[in-house]
């Protein structure tokens, strides 16, 4: 039996929806927007109400122009100051608090990247609210879904905080269209520099390969490769597929590759069109970081390896024979 909602309840629900407003904290490198920000904008749009983006930094005019064209963005707030160089959370937090105070945003969010995970807990603490981390679905403006137990279970969280602060798993939401929008831009509210930390320098490793979290194809290796030198087999294969190269935690802990290549619960979350797992047994922590991939191919000589339980295609064979053969076949095409 269904019971109709009282008119007063419907009016309150409509009122709440009408007054929803979300502030997306843009992650960027001054001249380019981080892809996860586009996924976060899509998530923010599902809350209903107006979506604004806050861009803080130095010489970030191009990012502002690009954001104004993104579908679903109503307003871009801009704060340019040397204090925001490097997007330090200590400096960004007072700016976000002042912006929220002036515009009364009901939601504040960012991508669940190192940037967002570093910033949002501080913002939430200052607002005296509990943040919701790494959401994968939005059921309503106050109800979110996130994974627990290394991705083996889903947890639905109802948030009754006055301001909802949450981070968004980029792989769970489509990227917002980068054209079709016509947002206005204006200066963000001013805030005083905290001055307790200073951005000194950043050294980035440049690679011709795609960035791991944004690649359409990922080739990952595990402890089965036996050494860091043997990862050259994966690099050669990845070159033919225009793929990024990742690794399991076991391979990282063994010192085969640096930890910025780690895929998994404590590493990077990926969801490419094609994921090739080479010499990876399939610990649940690794599966949590790649199980949403569209197609998974596993290569392992152990037919009982857990990775085969999630793989769409499995090759039970010696990787030192199979991978070079795959590379040679691709070279001939």
Swiss-Prot record:
One of its GO terms (molecular function) is electron transfer activity. This is Electron transfer flavoprotein subunit alpha, mitochondrial. It comes from the Eukaryota. The modification N6-acetyllysine is found at residues 59, 62, 69, 75, 85, 101, 139, 158, 164, 203, 226, 232. Residues 20-204 are annotated as: Domain I. Residues 1-19 form a transit peptide. Its main location: mitochondrion. GO terms for cellular component: electron transfer flavoprotein complex; mitochondrial electron transfer flavoprotein complex; mitochondrial matrix; mitochondrion. The modification Phosphothreonine is found at residue 93. Keywords: Acetylation, Electron transport, FAD, Flavoprotein, Mitochondrion, Phosphoprotein, Transit peptide, Transport. The modification N6-succinyllysine is found at residues 59, 69, 85, 158, 187, 203, 216, 226, 232, 301. Heterodimeric electron transfer flavoprotein that accepts electrons from several mitochondrial dehydrogenases, including acyl-CoA dehydrogenases, glutaryl-CoA and sarcosine dehydrogenase. It transfers the electrons to the main mitochondrial respiratory chain via ETF-ubiquinone oxidoreductase (ETF dehydrogenase). Required for normal mitochondrial fatty acid oxidation and normal amino acid metabolism. It comes from Mus musculus. The modification Phosphoserine is found at residue 140. Its cofactor is FAD. Belongs to the ETF alpha-subunit/FixB family. The gene is Etfa.
